[in-house]
Amino acid sequence: MLVRIVAVMLLLSAGIVAEAMSHSFVCKASGRLGGPIRFEFYRNSSTHPKTDIESFTVSIRTADDRWKTMWSIFSHRGLTEPIEYGVTPPGFTTMIKPQKLIPGHVYAGFASDGHGGSSKVTFGFDKDGTMIFLDNPLD
């Protein structure tokens, strides 16, 4: 019985530590088709830029409600400026080459800082190429 109590306490402690180590941050997307599409990252508001991004992926929502990677980059160095779609920042490595973004589809930008932090922005483009933002469909 004592072993079970200790095991449960250890599991609860591990869960609390894991929750404390994970956190989210803000990812803002801007731009339009035919022009630059930029992604900026902030700690908790638009006043404190976050530069310790280690990975960034843009994915498309498929017809069977899954995500397919359209572009993916990785680094251990961090950012000095916003990420522009299809342009690999200095110090980053392209894992998957960028594919063309088209109107009428749902996309998501996923970012990780390498120490438990993550962010996601869901977006699309209307017929004239204007970026529109979506409320995380089918998550």
Summary of predicted features, one role per range:
Residues 5-14:
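Sec-dependent N-terminal signal peptides
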Residues 59-96:
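Extended, solvent-exposed segments with strong compositional bias
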Residues 105-109:
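Short beta-strand segments enriched for Tyr within beta-sheet-rich domains
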Residues 113-120:
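Short acidic/polar inter-strand loop motif in beta-rich domains
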Residues 98-104:
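Surface-exposed, short loops/turns at beta-strand junctions within beta-sandwich domains
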Residues 17-64, 120-139:
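N-terminal non-catalytic regions of secreted/periplasmic and cell-surface proteins
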